[in-house]
Amino acid sequence: MAARRTILLGLCASLALTGTLATGASARLHYPLPPDSTAVNGVAQQKVSHARMPAQEIRLAPLPDKGLHPGAALWLKRPYAGTPTDVLRYHNDNYPTGWNPNETDLTPASVASASFGQITTLNVDGNVMAEPLLVSNFQMPDNSTHDVLIVATGHDTIYAYDAQTYAVLWQRSLGTPQSTGDVGCSDIKPEYGISSTPVIVRSAQNAATIYVVAATEPAHLSFHTKLHAIDLGTGKDLMRPHEIAPAASLETGGKIHFDPQNQWSRSSLAYANGAIYMGIGSHCDSNAGAISGWVLRYDAATLQLTGKFNTIEAAAGYELSSVWMSGYSVALDPAGNVYAITGNGNYSLTKGHKGYGESVIALAPDLNRTPIGTFTPSNWQSLNNGDTDFGSGGAMLLPVAPGQTAPPMLVGMGKAGTMYLLDASSLRGLEGQGGYQALQKIQLSACWCGAAYYAGPAGGVVYYQGNGDLLRAFSVAIDGTPSLTQVAASSDGAGSGGAFPVVSSNGATSGTAVVWAIERGNPTEQIKAYNAATLGAPLFAANAGNWSNGSRSYLTPLVANGRVYVGAFKTVTVFGLTN
């Protein structure tokens, strides 16, 4: 069901902080490695095959409640040893890799020590589905300087906290959220408000804009979805919010419209080249025959709609083709091209029946009507018939490494548990047609999840954790035979649906990388940390909040400036070092 469903890595700080992408014709992605690093060439390749695990509701055995670390008060006075960094969008960058390469305090050694633990819990007014975001060293209108933590809730509230003292700098309600009962879909309870991670565009030390989508119901059964541009310093709208209401003409006549009751902004927002991008999915596959998935583009300066792509072009039963990706954002390459994966829906390129269900789609920056490339699994019909969305997982671009002879690559995965490695520069339609094949297919566990990437001292590594499965690490071969090879695995499994891991490290320095993942249970959420090089047993594990339906939480932690933030039901739990 639908709701059950640049930085150039190691790049200059200013590019990472603004979330902007390099322009130009090339769609190759690059990151520099330190001189003593080696690419993953010549590694023996292997096929990794694991039986697909069925979807399951997992109840985690609660960990002993460690509560606040005894040194929590000391942590509030502890300065960050490195240069503070910003996290302005979902999963850190536009690929989106989930890698923060600017972390100096949190290492495998420090996280495993007795000095690491829970610092505090922030109480908020609703579900925290959106990843918290962080703006460091920001000058407020009164000229005071703060590291600002942004938290958005399902109750349509945005909080701005001082990320040292956790005093509330401001909070803002964007309206009355939509009632789950009125919407008619109870995947998320009790309300739908802000569900997608906002994106922040920072232009100066004292100037930043939060772009956020809020679903509201100001009167009974009066549904609205609006894009806001909010001043980070004051919490006020910088311009009139824009009603999200795209429409498109169909090849078969008539129009398709956005449905604010049965559709929502679940895919996180992204920013590139002056534009805000978002994906639109459906609630519980409701009103399936009358709605389409969308990728939308808005001018960041005016909030006006400047581009749209509807994933169906002909009216027919059970179309949908939602762009929801369990909260993962669209991916953007350095040329500004947009990549997404669609969910349940028909696939056809025949006029009068055209649709892009169960597909990776690549779109030009302006979202021109014709995709620049697509990939559709050969078994798309069985995926569609079995509610086994390809689009329950996100698309992640892999950075092009120095000396890489392989083409730019993309990984994607979904409920069927197949991880596809694709040539991102040559997406050529239906798998098997004309001999077209993925670069590699690896059978793993079902995914309501997303991958992460880290460029370590031995080269690129992809991290993936599916439903009830182990966290797995795959090295990336970048020679003429591109492939993924499993090189490590955790000793413990995931919760319901899998995880959205993130990686923190001090660049590619050996011994500094940690993989973080939220294990989703019902109702308990747990945060776990692993040595990125070896995985194995967790370095640290702790309860980090509850959720009314853990398999639907789709949570991603924020890791930056020596701290870890985990959103849950009406809380954000903060972890860090005390000395």
Residue ranges of predicted features:
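N-terminal pre-domain segments of enzymes
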Residues: 28-99
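Boundary at the C-terminal end of the N-terminal hydrophobic targeting segment
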Residues: 22-27
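Inter-blade linker and blade-boundary elements of WD-repeat/beta-propeller domains
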Residues: 432-444, 485-491, 544
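Mobile, glycine-rich extracellular loop/lid and propeptide segments
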Residues: 71, 75, 82-402, 407-430, ...
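Short, intrinsically disordered, charge-balanced linker/junction segments flanking boundaries
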Residues: 39-45, 490, 508-520
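A beta-strand-loop signature enriched in Asp, Gly, Thr, and Trp
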Residues: 472-504
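Bacterial N-terminal signal peptides that target proteins for export
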Residues: 1-11
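Bacterial N-terminal signal peptides
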Residues: 10-20
